[in-house]
């Protein structure tokens, strides 16, 4: 059985870890980094992921996708999506089913399809380290992700060629990473997770007793559209406004300028965590009839803090709700853990310290803790980690729409999962032969104010007066937090059950097609790699042959020279094309045309060998007169 890997699929950065010798190990990617930017770029002939994609973003802004996690499992008309439509340099579109998709070079793509490219890179990173194929993974999601977003994340895993063994909440994973070595006593931990695109707070009780550990989530809350990207956008808008005041030009209309501005804003934000002021300097940011324009704006830490103050305050309300749901006060919290890159901001740390009345722990890496926790959970599933029990919760209440457009809850938020619940309902009209089960997720009483997860019909109900038929509705949430629903007519025993797919979401056929596309691209990538290899070999041979022709000089007959030159020209022409077989054929013909050249080179080499042999005999003749001397090797440090 192969290893199950742990993946933190982040909004800004992603990370992969595996259990190695009983310990979770964060793996370095091909670029030598422990985290990979969650950025994907599409060019004419390839898909680029991570740091290389980030580097080319300025020149390819409309086909470079970042923060895709903010779109996953969302509808195009959602307010959160509409906010992003106006500020993202790439195109966000409405799919046929109403989902938010993206478009690149005329191709429409679902967010899980794009996210799968990041997961593929994580998979490859793990395979390079382990030296074997990886097919199974534990993937993390924000605790406050709804059913649609969890389903979409699992779809992304499937498209990437991974069997997702478990979806685990990010704060829970961070608590696992923190608590796995704490062997005795009880701790109540608050995990404050402010990442690139999402915010979560989870209150978790860690019970360690005689080697057995239980991680029980008491409550969770959050905002799936609040994170570092929003902090960046505040700074981007400020810089764009200041530039417009000075120059009268709106940079928001120029995608290339906005991409440069985004990179500069992110860099300035990071710098202001360790310094009190910085300068954003972008020469030639744009131009008008009077010539090129340069952006030079000084920013202080205080200015940045004033721009994002309300965002930081927005994170405090979920803290209060989570504590109330767990029936705890701030004094009951033993430790506070910060997760997510945005928690490096001093103002965020100050707000958390003031709220809880204690300093957060500094021994948890905010960028890596979630992946480490995912790897530990992978170890639990594979049996490599024993005596650890993880009890997670569903973040939002689940129920159905009943008469009067009311949401009737079957499972309350913060219920430990997996769990089941059932309730008996009846008909609203006389002789009603079918009922529609409309499944909802949320906390509002009015059905339409909650998230619709889907609906299905139970028909064949025997005619009867309203209120007489008994319809039992069963909700079953699995360990991934994904819902399965059934409805049964208790009189006839007729049953209808479904795994809830969002009223939008990808169909089974769409996911299967995307999996096939990904496999086809894997073949394409392999062929492309082989083509490049053939080109490089052919190019190297031409270079070496030219050199040998020059060295041979007049010893090479002009007839052979012409034949070799024609063969080299043929190779050069073949290299410019995309036909691997044509390149290899031209390469072989050059080798054959160079036969005479090889003979000359070998003869020259043998002649030099003879000269060296004579020199060796002379040296041996005087060897008896030579006295051995002690010597000390002197190493040349300049090498």
Swiss-Prot record:
<feature type="compositionally biased region" description="Acidic residues">
    <location>
        <begin position="625"/>
        <end position="639"/>
    </location>
</feature>
<keyword id="KW-0346">Stress response</keyword>
<keyword id="KW-0597">Phosphoprotein</keyword>
<dbReference type="InterPro" id="IPR013126">
    <property type="entry name" value="Hsp_70_fam"/>
</dbReference>
<comment type="function">
    <text>Acts as a chaperone.</text>
</comment>
<dbReference type="Pfam" id="PF00012">
    <property type="entry name" value="HSP70"/>
</dbReference>
<dbReference type="InterPro" id="IPR029048">
    <property type="entry name" value="HSP70_C_sf"/>
</dbReference>
<keyword id="KW-0547">Nucleotide-binding</keyword>
<protein>
    <recommendedName>
        <fullName>Chaperone protein DnaK</fullName>
    </recommendedName>
</protein>
<feature type="modified residue" description="Phosphothreonine; by autocatalysis">
    <location>
        <position position="198"/>
    </location>
</feature>
<keyword id="KW-0143">Chaperone</keyword>
<comment type="similarity">
    <text>Belongs to the heat shock protein 70 family.</text>
</comment>
<dbReference type="GO" id="GO:0140662">
    <property type="term" value="F:ATP-dependent protein folding chaperone"/>
</dbReference>
<dbReference type="InterPro" id="IPR018181">
    <property type="entry name" value="Heat_shock_70_CS"/>
</dbReference>
<dbReference type="GO" id="GO:0051082">
    <property type="term" value="F:unfolded protein binding"/>
</dbReference>
<dbReference type="GO" id="GO:0005524">
    <property type="term" value="F:ATP binding"/>
</dbReference>
<feature type="region of interest" description="Disordered">
    <location>
        <begin position="602"/>
        <end position="639"/>
    </location>
</feature>
<dbReference type="InterPro" id="IPR029047">
    <property type="entry name" value="HSP70_peptide-bd_sf"/>
</dbReference>
<dbReference type="InterPro" id="IPR012725">
    <property type="entry name" value="Chaperone_DnaK"/>
</dbReference>
<dbReference type="InterPro" id="IPR043129">
    <property type="entry name" value="ATPase_NBD"/>
</dbReference>
<keyword id="KW-0067">ATP-binding</keyword>
